[in-house]
Amino acid sequence: MNLHPRDIDETPDRDAAAAALAVLRRWASGATSTEISELDPSVARLLPDAALSNYPDLSRQYPEDFTVDATYRAGLPDLQNGPSSLIRGAKQQIQHVGISNFRLPIRFHRKEGDDLTLETSVTGTVSLEAGKKGINMSRIMRSFYKHAERTFSFEVIEAALDDYMTDLDSFDARIQMRFSYPERIESLRSGLSGYQYYDIALELVEQGGERLKIMHLDYVYSSTCPCSLELSEHARSSRGQLATPHSQRSVARLSVVVDGDASCLWFEDLIALCRRAVPTETQVMVKREDEQAFAELNAANPIFVEDAARLFCAELLADHRIGDFRVVASHQESLHSHDAVSVLTEGATFATASLDPRLFATLFHVG
């Protein structure tokens, strides 16, 4: 009997493939692992629950006793320090790359009294040259932690910046530290006092070989609308109608470049500057006499958002310790469904043609 095999170049259809698969499974079910490996190790995958003889037997237990020596460490892959051929996308310089919001307790000097230890959120970034793949971000944290036990000032931040610029071989760098700073504030008339918390950030920037020391402060105050105040008084005087002017909680964010050659600009100094410019700071502890006093204080200092920006500006211009600055104010209207906002800048540091779309949305008080 002569057998005429089918043309092996013929493309099988699905039924032919299913038949061949069934044949392989029947054969593999009775074959040894050696026979399967000799034919093709992948055939073993056709068997349900069959161990794959070509797959390594890996441990699933965490090796608690394993230790890393210098030789092992040297052999670990380091993709971020790889060749430029590994770069994905455009080979372009990155101005800022690093880590944001790593937190630790930091000790700060006060103008008077003992130092304070405050939970601090740190952001550290460096520039990345066009031909470099990436950075080892943990080095930023390690460099910062070398100084974490010191009482912080701009001088200590500079030392930390020097360390991680050296460790990461970068030419530009930035450190920003955010924290909530408490100050005990006395009530207007009752003699009570309580802690007011101020959102403060210290920022040190090295760019093009020059360093800038920047302090940011959020100041929360009450703004009484001058127009609403006059309209309310008109209703009272002309028609005997009781009316209430609208006022609202408002926030100003002051960002100032600190003159490194001048005397120290304390946190308390910048807070006092804000209070001189706009004295209607929100209160902490109040009794009835304090609430009445606050109403009188607001009536004596009605203020549009334009006024706020210029009043802060006047105080900032008068302080020789302050260079360039920016004032961003937001009056969160009780009359309108929208906010009234203003931005005033002095000098080139904060001048920009574009604003962050979320800038004004960040100006709110967290109780």
Curated annotation (Swiss-Prot):
Q: What organism is recorded for this protein?
A: Ruegeria pomeroyi (strain ATCC 700808 / DSM 15171 / DSS-3)
Q: Name the residues annotated as site: May be catalytically important.
A: C225
Q: What is this protein called?
A: GTP cyclohydrolase FolE2
- Domain of life of the organism in this record? Bacteria
From its record, what is one biological process in GO terms?
A: tetrahydrofolate biosynthetic process
Q: What is its EC number?
A: 3.5.4.16
The family assignment reads: Belongs to the GTP cyclohydrolase IV family.
Q: Which Pfam families match?
A: GCHY-1
Could you state a single Gene Ontology molecular function term? GTP cyclohydrolase I activity
Q: Which UniProt keywords apply?
A: Hydrolase
Pathway assigned to this chain's UniProt record:
Cofactor biosynthesis; 7,8-dihydroneopterin triphosphate biosynthesis; 7,8-dihydroneopterin triphosphate from GTP: step 1/1
Q: Catalyses which reaction?
A: GTP + H2O = 7,8-dihydroneopterin 3'-triphosphate + formate + H(+)
Described purpose of this protein according to its UniProt entry: Converts GTP to 7,8-dihydroneopterin triphosphate.
